[in-house]
Amino acid sequence: MRLLPLLLLASTLLFAEINLPENFQAKFIQKITNTKKHVIQYPGKVQFSDEKRFKWSYVKPTKKEVCTDGSELVVVDHDLEQVSSYYITDGLDIAKILKKATLHSKNVYVAQYKNIKYTIQIDSKQKLHSIAYFDDLDNKVQIVFKNMKYGKGNLPAEKMKCNYPRSYDMIRG
């Protein structure tokens, strides 16, 4: 009889997965550590909706917004008064990354996606807490989320767009 609860627990852990909400909003700190151990921190707010739409609003060291709908990436640098727009074919697909994630230890998951290993941590309420990986330049990237709020339904499309004055320079890539 003692074996049954252990088998149930083992099967639950074996098939545990991270549930992605329809939308989320949070504050974050993105910490980038280069190969010489130099660290730069970028705090801000993030919004996610519709499996592919992101809006990252950075407040330091420069005020910047990064928005994507999965096919176009828009970067607004308010200090430079410049907007860069790129069509992307291979963007960050958080839904696919989380679907590939397997439980590594309590509240820690690991996912291999497009030759990058992601370490994903969830909090005690099963909400996304952090994502860490090494980028193409061997920088360690860690994003820690705070005040994570999950929601149902998609956020309004207008809320997910980067806003900028028409006077900003536009660069298309």
Language-model segment annotations:
Residues 19-37, 47:
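A short, Trp-centered hydrophobic/proline-enriched beta-strand micro-motif
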Residues 30, 58-62, 70-72, 79, ...:
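A mature extracytoplasmic/lumenal domain signature
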